[in-house]
């Protein structure tokens, strides 16, 4: 069965006609494009790269000064496109040329733009205070960067990278692409995913699907091998870390749990080493972005060299010294430990132990660091898989998926099931959260629930969409609010509103509310301006477990208070219309029961509120029966038996 069994209009392949598709790994540090040729997925090299730039990687170290922070390229790096864009009055450079201009013109050279995708300007400034760019805020608070070619936003910068990769693929395939699969971190939120789609649209690409990076790696590894069981995908890239626990069974590929940290990656290794080099060299870099870039370039080159050698000689800003693998490992050890803590949480979420993991797939260039491989191997108790280049494995998996979705493999038996990381729900009366789609539900998914009005004659309803695991609104994350208007003025509980939550294959959420009798409808697509980090998601899950008992107690109390308020409001309306049906003694008894209920509602004992509500209900049963009789008499007045 092909993934989702959905064919895009106009993309059904004719017999013997192969459609051109590509998989794109849009990375924080480097990006790649891959395709399937002769049945094999392979990354595509930049054949236009100048031969004089191709020198052995070892020459990056050994004390040679890199002129203006120039990054020299070895043969193996032809496939990589640095995710760097340089804006200058004459045009735009992308990739290695832009990368080599970063030290000379840091203000106009934008790198690691993926970290800015879908985030507000305030969030970016808080998370990354040392960025050299001149930021401006758009009307909705999103970041704009001042460049020599005017203001640009992260979506436009990403579009330049995608455009360059698409041109490489089209040159290699000698034709226009029919569609692409683009990979994103598993914890990209709605805004970040939508931003990626918008960038692809700007680049003129048809997106077949966004695919989680760890999932793409598992396609490249696990499904090719035909194994069944539980595997872990450890993805440590330049800017993000993801851990995914996946189950492979009879062609079904299911994500059991995901975790990680959207603000942790190899870039952080580089910055730690650059800071250490700055201290050793005694260089002041606060106001010199060129020296900052040079330090970072030297740190990157040293890190690469230390994956093969025990020591590396470095030279920066007139200072020359030596850095050892042991020194690097002491700097990055706390960060590696953070990744293992995320692995532990993911295993717990998946309900499996490390012993049950069949294979560990390593993804991302940062997994070449010996300490990372050693620590991951010790944690899972097995040697990680590294046979596919960790820089290329995600792009290869995306290419395999693109080949299927474009229609070249209609008989594929691959089925992919991703999950949402946190429950989605609505606010109900009393500040309670009604979960509509629970956490770890496979996507795409759609769920609907019916809600009703609280007050008589209610003509509108506020829909408050929430994300989280807690029972009360104040403890969950607000995603969006919208209002459904035009409800028929019925008694409380008379209107029936069907609310549908729909999460598509890319993880984007749409919420629709419809009143069933009139068909009035309102909807919203949730695009938060910035998202949660993986640590914040993990903390939300942890808090829900730590506060489970108190949350249940608080929910019971709120539910009883809402029920009591509903009874009191209904009784108030009935007394306003038909108080004459009661004797003075009955009125006094009801008033006493009302006072008792109101008193109990101020307390914190849900059982006492429930008992007082039942007592008031019992006290008003005769009154309710008389009202019904009176209503029937009024309805029959003036009519004969035959008319009835």
Curated annotation (Swiss-Prot):
Disulfide bonds: none annotated. One of its GO terms (molecular function) is ATP binding. The keyword ATP-binding applies. GO terms for biological process: iron-sulfur cluster assembly. InterPro entries: ATPase_NBD (IPR043129), Heat_shock_70_CS (IPR018181), HscA_NBD (IPR042039), HSP70_C_sf (IPR029048), HSP70_peptide-bd_sf (IPR029047), Hsp_70_fam (IPR013126), ISC_FeS_clus_asmbl_HscA (IPR010236). It comes from the Bacteria. Keywords: ATP-binding, Chaperone, Nucleotide-binding. Chaperone involved in the maturation of iron-sulfur cluster-containing proteins. Has a low intrinsic ATPase activity which is markedly stimulated by HscB. Involved in the maturation of IscU. Belongs to the heat shock protein 70 family. This is Chaperone protein HscA. It comes from Yersinia pseudotuberculosis serotype I (strain IP32953).
């Amino acid at each position: 069965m092909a993934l989702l069994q959905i064919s895009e209009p106009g993309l059904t392949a004719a017999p013997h006609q192969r459609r051109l598709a590509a998989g794109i790994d849009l990375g924080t540090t480097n990006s790649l494009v891959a395709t399937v040729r002769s049945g094999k997925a392979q990354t595509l090299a930049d054949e236009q790269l100048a031969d004089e730039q191709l020198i052995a990687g070892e020459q990056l170290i050994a004390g040679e000064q890199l002129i203006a922070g120039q990054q020299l390229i070895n043969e193996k790096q032809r496939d990589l496109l640095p995710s760097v864009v340089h804006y200058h009055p004459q045009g735009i450079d992308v990739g290695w040329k832009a990368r080599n201009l970063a030290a000379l013109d840091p203000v106009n050279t934008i790198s690691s733009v993926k970290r800015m995708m879908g985030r507000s300007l305030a969030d970016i400034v808080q998370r990354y205070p040392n960025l050299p760019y001149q930021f401006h805020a758009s009307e909705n608070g999103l970041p704009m960067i001042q460049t020599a070619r005017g203001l640009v936003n992260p979506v436009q910068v990403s579009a330049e990278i995608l455009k360059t990769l698409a041109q490489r693929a089209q040159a290699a395939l000698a034709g226009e692409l029919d569609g692409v699969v683009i990979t994103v971190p598993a914890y990209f939120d709605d805004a970040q995913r939508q931003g990626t789609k918008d960038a692809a649209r700007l680049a003129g690409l048809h997106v077949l699907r966004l695919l989680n990076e760890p999932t793409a790696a598992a396609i490249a590894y696990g499904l090719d091998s035909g194994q069944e069981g539980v595997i872990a995908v450890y993805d440590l890239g330049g800017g993000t870390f993801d851990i995914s626990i996946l189950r492979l069974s009879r062609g079904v590929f299911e994500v059991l749990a995901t975790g990680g940290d959207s603000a942790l990656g190899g870039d952080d290794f580089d910055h730690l080493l650059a800071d250490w080099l700055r201290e050793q060299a005694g260089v002041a870099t606060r106001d010199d972005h060129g020296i900052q870039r040079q330090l970072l370039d030297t740190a990157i080159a040293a890190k690469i060299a230390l994956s093969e050698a025990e020591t590396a000689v470095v030279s920066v800003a007139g200072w020359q010294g030596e850095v050892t693998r042991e020194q690097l490992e002491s700097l990055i050890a706390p960060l590696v430990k953070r990744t293992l803590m995320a692995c532990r949480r993911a295993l717990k979420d998946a309900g499996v132990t490390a012993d049950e993991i069949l294979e560990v797939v390593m993804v991302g260039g940062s997994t070449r660091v010996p300490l990372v491989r050693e620590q991951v191997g010790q944690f899972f108790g097995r040697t990680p898989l590294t046979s596919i280049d960790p820089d290329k494995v995600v792009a290869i998996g995306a290419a395999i998926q693109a080949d299927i979705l474009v229609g070249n493999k209609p008989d594929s038996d691959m089925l992919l099931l991703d999950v949402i990381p946190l429950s989605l729900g609505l606010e109900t009366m009393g500040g309670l959260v009604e979960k509509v789609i629970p956490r770890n539900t496979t996507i795409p998914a759609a769920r609907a629930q019916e809600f009703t009005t609280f007050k008589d004659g209610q003509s509108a309803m506020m829909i408050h969409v929430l994300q989280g695991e807690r029972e009360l609104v104040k403890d969950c994350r607000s995603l969006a609010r919208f209002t459904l208007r035009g409800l028929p003025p019925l008694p409380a509980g008379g209107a029936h509103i069907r609310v549908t939550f729909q999460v598509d294959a890319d993880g984007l959420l749409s919420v629709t509310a419809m009143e069933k009798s009139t068909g009035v409808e309102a909807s919203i697509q949730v695009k938060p301006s910035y998202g949660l980090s993986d640590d914040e998601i993990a903390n939300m899950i942890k808090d829900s477990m730590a506060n489970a008992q108190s949350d249940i107690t608080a929910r019971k109390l709120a539910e009883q208070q809402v029920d009591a308020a509903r009874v009191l409001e209904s009784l108030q309306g009935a007394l306003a219309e038909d108080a004459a049906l009661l004797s003075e003694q009955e009125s006094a008894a009801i008033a006493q029961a009302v006072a008792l209920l109101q008193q109990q509602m101020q307390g914190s004992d849900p059982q006492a509120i429930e008992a007082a509500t039942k007592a008031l209900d019992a006290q008003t049963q005769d009154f309710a029966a008389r009202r019904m009789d009176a209503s029937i008499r009024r309805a029959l007045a003036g009519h004969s038996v035959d008319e009835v």
